[in-house]
């Protein structure tokens, strides 16, 4: 009987270690980028100020299920002492390790947060990203080492981040990013 219990305990621990997570964050890549430039006819064209930069936060994630109907990526961005929050809900998530989500902060918002000072990379203090499915956290990753849920006690500012479809980057690299779920 002791042998059966021992085998069961060993098998149970092996199977627990052998389980894979449905979703896993692999990388957080922040970048400061300029607005895309488009040429068109039929109206007056305006040149964007190429010195102004958007904050782009790209996340790479792995998905184990063949397809998932919905996955929410929640972002916590600490920029110049202000905690910005935003989320993007994706649909039709395929299995694989090259799935990407992205969120943006406009140049005007960054200028506002800098209180008139020049926007610098040093102002980006930290980023945490969570993957949620049906409200359950599936994974969490932080850009720089910090205590667990460092953002929880801080005042949060929502509404200052944009998903890709809400930016001038919407038509670019369509097949690089997961499909954004639209409200209907």
Labelled PLM ranges:
Residues 92-94, 133-184:
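Short beta-strand elements
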Residues 111-126:
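Short glycine/proline/serine/threonine-rich loop/turn segments at secondary-structure transition edges
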Residues 83-108, 142-149:
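Solvent-exposed serine/threonine-rich low-complexity stretches and specific carbohydrate-binding patches
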Residues 44-61, 68-70:
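Contiguous beta-strand segments within globular domains
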Residues 69-87, 125-134:
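Extended low-complexity, serine/threonine- and proline-enriched intrinsically disordered segments
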Residues 60-63, 77:
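Hydrophobic beta-strand positions in extracellular immunoglobulin-like domains
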Residues 19-50, 160-184:
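Short, compositionally biased P/S/T/A/G/V-rich stretches that sit at domain boundaries
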Residues 4-15:
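Bacterial N-terminal signal peptides
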């Amino acid at each position: 009987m002791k042998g059966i219990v021992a085998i069961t305990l060993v098998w149970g621990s092996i199977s627990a270690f052998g389980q894979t997570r449905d979703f896993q964050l692999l990388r957080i890549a922040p970048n400061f980028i300029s607005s895309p430039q488009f040429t068109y006819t039929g109206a007056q064209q305006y040149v964007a100020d190429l010195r102004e930069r958007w904050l782009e936060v790209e996340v790479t994630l792995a998905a184990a299920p063949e397809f998932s109907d919905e996955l929410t990526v929640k972002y916590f961005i600490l920029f110049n002492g202000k905690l910005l929050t935003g989320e993007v809900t994706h649909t039709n998530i395929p299995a694989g390790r090259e799935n990407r989500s992205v969120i943006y902060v406009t140049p005007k918002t960054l200028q506002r947060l800098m209180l008139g000072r020049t926007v610098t990379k040093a102002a980006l203090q930290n980023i945490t990203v969570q993957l949620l499915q049906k409200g359950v956290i599936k994974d969490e990753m932080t850009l720089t080492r910090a205590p667990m849920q460092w953002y929880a006690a801080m005042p949060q500012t929502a509404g200052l981040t944009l998903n890709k479809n809400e930016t001038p980057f919407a038509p670019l690299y369509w097949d690089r990013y997961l499909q954004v779920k639209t409200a209907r």
